[in-house]
Amino acid sequence: SKPGEGWIVEDECIVRVQRAGHLYTKASFKDFDFSFEWKITPGCNSGVKYRVADYSGEVLGPEYQLVDDAKRKYSPGSKSATSSLYAIKGASAKKKMKPIGEFNHSRILAKGNHLEHWLNGEKVLQIEIGSKEWHELHATSKFKTRPNFATKKGRIMLQDHGGKVWFRNL
């Protein structure tokens, strides 16, 4: 399939309906405040990556994870659960996610080395790139061989990683 072919516009939403490849912004951003609404189907795995750029020869970016935590048996604070900074830091275990099939509101704030993830009006994750906490978590992550990970100006990406996902009000 051609890039973007499995994404459609339906009821004012961008919807991933079949394997399609990721969707990227044309512009690149380093400092931004990005809000969006999303919902997923049971078992779905998706995400919003940001500061997507070439990091040591691979196109990567930090990810605000969107996933069916229960179906995948992720604890709420897991580094793989919804709202986590995927593979680096889990979101608050007290996060309030709406049931599968209902829209959630998320926000990503990136300013310099400061990153925040929000879910349904509550800040659920905060980290400073370069801090002691960052160095400890980054050193044990799959991104440990990329010392400048998450620091570059880059594109925002809607991830195609399996399952039907809706995005609106981006």
Language model region names:
Residues 1-169:
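Carbohydrate-interacting regions of secretory-pathway proteins
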